[in-house]
Structures are given as structure tokens and as C-alpha cells.
Amino acid sequence: MKKILLSAVLVISLFAQEKNFVEIGAGFINSKDNFSTNELSNISSLASASDENEGVALVDFYYGYQTSDATTVYASMFLGELSLGTNFMTDIGSFDVGITTGLGGKEWQNPFLTNTNRAKTDVSEIGAHVDYGFSLAKAHNVQLIYSYSVKSYDTETVQDSLKRDGSRHIIALENSYTPEFGKGQFTYLFNTSLENYDAKGDASTYDAIMFEFGITADITKNVNLTAIAGLGSKEYDQSNPVFGKTVETDISSLVGVLKWERPFEYKNFYSTLKVGYEEEDANVEFYDKENTFTLLSLGYRF
């Protein structure tokens, strides 16, 4: 399944504290993305992408095994990304170290070709992460995350300055604050992330920044709603030789998660509805992107 939204991953990370669960679901994605292989293989111009619809299946899980009072080893999968790691508690906070890999995907060997069939190529990405969690106050929690990954394309036929093989660095800071006056019924969220993608080609190398604000609140005893809005930007390092300018992009997103605990009084079960929208508005039409997704799933804790 294609990567949907960074926001969605951050929202789902809120529920990763619920150890040992499996969640199965399905949904759809409506998107506009010239770099997606769901788009037409033969395009006549380098203009905005057309709409595409895709049905998706969802299998998320987390399984942790406590090797000591302070250490847990785990395996997890969220939105098609498989992680293996270790979490351990110390006097100064919690640490999480692990490796992450996607299930593989496909992209165009050369997405900029027109009036000819574009060929697909296999793409893989594998990386590692280090997380540090701590608290500055009783009502405040912080998660500092650094992740590094390497992305590889089997075959690329673009110009050298557009080569996309590269390494990705992400630094993220996730904050949550649960005020005492709310009696624990709602929590404010503030997330910041910085991304550097260092590609072989300077015209495919970029820096991105994202700010996200949100709230999670108990609607009823068994129903919780989380909403996160994001704003950000992305800027490439060098002028794109196909378009004769450096690509710059404004990013906006909105993600909502509605969670229903013990539906119809079934113990250990829960149901989740995830909806989201993201837009990348670039100064080059070909780089414009839109994604809208809806996912409905049923989970079980064990």
C-alpha cells in the first residue's frame, strides 16, 4: 500500500501504546499523483495528474515481549511498514531502537516521458530509528524521533540530475499535553518534523518541514476522536532540467480518527475509522498532488 500521509502515521502512533493487538480493515484512496504507477502509463503532457481510485486492505499489528521489567522487544506493522525493535525504560525516560522496512513498491523508471508508455521499476526502502520519550511535567509528554533510511530504485532512465536513489533523514518532535482542568478527557497535540532527502541527483534532493496541531478527546465513555491539521513546505535543491525551475511545494493536511471501544459490548475489540486529506501545491503543475483516504478497521487486543 502506498504511503498515505505522515499525519496518519503520527495519529496511529498515539494508539501504539496499546500493546499486543491486531487490526484488520479496508478502504479506498482517491489521489492525483503523476509519480504514482496507478496513473496512466502514457501521458500526452506534463500537466496536472488525473483522478485515480484505489481499494486497499489494512493489516496492522503490534506484539511485544517483555524480557525484563524495563525492556520489551517487539514487532509491529503500521500502514505497510514493518518494524522490529527494542524499548527500554530508564531513570531519564524511555528509549526505542529499531529497524523499519516497507513491503516494496513500484514507481516509474522515468515519470517525465510523454507520448510513450512509461515503464515501472521496483523500489525498496529500509532504515532504522531511535526514539527518546520523556516528560517535562506531569501533564506533558515528549517523543523525540530520529529516523534514517535508504531508498533504492532497480532501474532509472532519468537524467543524472534527476536520479532518485538516496538517503532520508527525519527528525520529529511529538508533544502531547493533557490539562488537569479537562479531567483527562482531552489532550492537545503539537508535532514538528524536518526531512532531508539526499538523492543522487540534486534536482531530486529536497528539504521539507511540517507543523501539525491537533486534539484527541473522549466523546463518550467508549468513543474517542482525534483530529490533526498540518501545514508545511518542501523545496528541492536544484533547478529541474525538465521544467527549467526549482520546484517548491506548499503542503496542507487534515486527518481524523474515530475510535469505538468495545463495540456492541464485545470485550477486547475496538473499531476505528480513519479519514484524511493532503494536498501538495507546487509551482510546477506536474508536482501537484492530492490524496484523500478512508479506512475502516476492526481491532483485537490480546
Protein language model regions, located:
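Outer-membrane beta-barrel initiation region
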Residues: 17-70
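Sequence/structural signature of outer-membrane beta-barrel proteins
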Residues: 29-33, 70, 80-82, 104-108, ...
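Extracellular loop and loop/strand-boundary signature of outer-membrane beta-barrel proteins
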Residues: 46-49, 113-120, 125-127, 154-166, ...
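Outer-membrane beta-barrel "beta-signal"
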Residues: 61, 260-262, 274, 289-302
